[in-house]
Regions:
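Polysaccharide-binding and catalytic clefts of secreted carbohydrate-active enzymes
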Residues: 1-173
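Short, intrinsically disordered, charge-balanced linker/junction segments flanking boundaries
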Residues: 174-181
Length: 181
């Protein structure tokens, strides 16, 4: 669970220990912070209080949630994260919640690394732009727009859009450039 403070603390210790040793090496030119990072908070019951707090901050009042969802919840504590992809409003809120967890993680880890090295920081994300795996976007927390300013450069993994399949439309091939800074 990347939102767990113990996980964040472990990452901070790892980054500090690693980059105090190699951070100023002339051989280090870049740091790939994550390789195809994904997260699905709904598989962690420990995230339910965070989810409920997210909803409370967004809607302020349980009646507003009930109106938005067409539901009849008595309190925010009754609302669990959806387990399946759906077109319902609750799933849109879940996507936003899940995306924010990973975005915060990317920004935090990038900031930690930036304390110890001047190497370029980036992440490898482009796999899930491909149209035929678009469902991955719905439940894997990969909203690149939220992450972009955490890194020195974005994109750069165009294998799937540039050379693999002839049937991939131009917009997917051009998407690679949209994530560059």
């Amino acid at each position: 669970n990347p939102a767990n403070p113990r996980y964040i603390n472990a990452v901070e210790i790892y980054v500090r220990d690693l980059f105090t040793r190699i951070g100023n090496s002339s051989a280090l030119c870049d740091v790939v912070i994550y390789n195809e990072p994904v997260y699905n908070a709904s598989v962690h019951e420990s995230c339910n209080p965070m989810w409920q707090n997210f909803l409370q901050n967004k809607y302020k009042d349980i009646s507003a949630v009930n109106t938005a969802y067409g539901a009849n919840y008595g309190s925010f504590e009754e609302i669990s994260m959806p387990k399946e992809v759906s077109g319902e409003k609750i799933f849109g809120d879940y996507m936003q919640f899940n995306d924010e967890i990973m975005s915060e993680l990317h920004h935090t880890v990038s900031e930690y690394i930036g304390k110890y090295t001047k190497a370029f920081r980036h992440t490898k994300v482009m796999q899930y732009i491909r149209p035929y795996v678009g469902g991955e976007r719905l439940n894997k927390s990969n909203n690149y727009e939220l992450w972009a300013n955490a890194f020195d450069v974005n994109g750069c993994d165009a294998f799937s859009a540039q050379a693999q399949e002839e049937h991939i439309p131009l917009y997917a091939k051009a998407a690679w450039y949209d994530y560059m800074r």
